[in-house]
Amino acid sequence: MGSSTGNMLVDREESLYRIFATSPLLLMAHCESTSIIEANIRAFKKKYKGQNDFPVRYHSRIRSVEACYASSALAVQMAKDTGARLHIAHVSTARELELFERKPIEEKKITAEAVIAHLMFSTEDYDTLGTRIKCNPAVKTPEDRAALREALTNGLIDVVATDHAPHLESEKLGGALRAVSGMPMIQFSLVSMLELSEMGVLPIERIPDLMAHNPAKLFHIEKRGFIRPGYYADLVLVDPDANWQVREGRYYTKCGWTPMDERFFKWRVSRTIMNGITAYSNGIVVDGVRGKELRFEI
């Protein structure tokens, strides 16, 4: 429902309504109003005549709070009208949180997700990180970030995801219009959440709910997301007293960069077990270990 990286836009209301009314599956939506975004771009081009790009800090005003809220509100209303199951991805604003209910995930037909970028960064970080934190939806104000953090524990946010988008650094050149949106985020997603717990944002017990249990429940993923007899052994061991700094050579994404560079973390992933097999241990990625396709209980 919002134009982002890739050709996946569906924004005609009649088409959307048909999808909402007929799909037996959980619908997952990226919600930004393309018409509002395009109007904002036109306004900036009029203001800065002759310029084909703008400083990256304007990205959050182009992909604005209004653009996010208008699209999310439309999706929620369609879900209510049709009875569809809806999951809104990467909610980025305090205002959007007004659309969701505080109750157990098992009782919800409309759920919401936050991503690491919006929980860790804000518009104040553009000055130091520039296009490295350019993503869609854009990072918002510190007040929006605070509201998202609070929603991790008050029942409004059900899932935390990575929105992992490992673009090359060369693709991140430019400003608000030219630089590609997205950032690599898988490697530092869990330690970021553990740091938020350390800061008192959420209890540590809430992290597996948001990052493992609830995704498995929502998408009916077979034998994943829980430590149970008969389930696949997908486990992570962490060191709570590592006290380390992110440096080049300490990250594993093939794109070769991270917005977390030079950040200090107290926690560190020490071992990753996938399908019962150690895939990573104390800085060493084990060659030849491969994942398995997910299966869904429909």
Question: In which residue ranges do the predicted regions lie?
Answer:
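Histidine/acidic residue-rich metal-binding segments in metalloenzymes
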Residues: G2, G6-V160
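Anionic group-transfer/hydrolysis microenvironments
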Residues: E32, S92, V115, A165, ...
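Glycine/Thr-rich phosphate-binding loops of Rossmann-like dinucleotide-binding domains
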Residues: I37, L97, M120, L168-S170, ...
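His/Asp/Glu-enriched, well-ordered alpha-helical/loop segment
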Residues: N52-G83, R132, T153-N154, D158-V160, ...
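C-terminal/domain-terminus segments
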Residues: E96-R102, G288-I298
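Short, glycine- and charge-enriched coil/turn segments that flank and shape catalytic ligand pockets
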Residues: I105-E107, Y126-L129, G174, G200-V201, ...
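Glycine-rich, flexible loop/turn motifs
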Residues: V115, T131, C135, A179-G182, ...
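C-terminal cap of metal-dependent C-N hydrolases
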Residues: G175, P229-R295
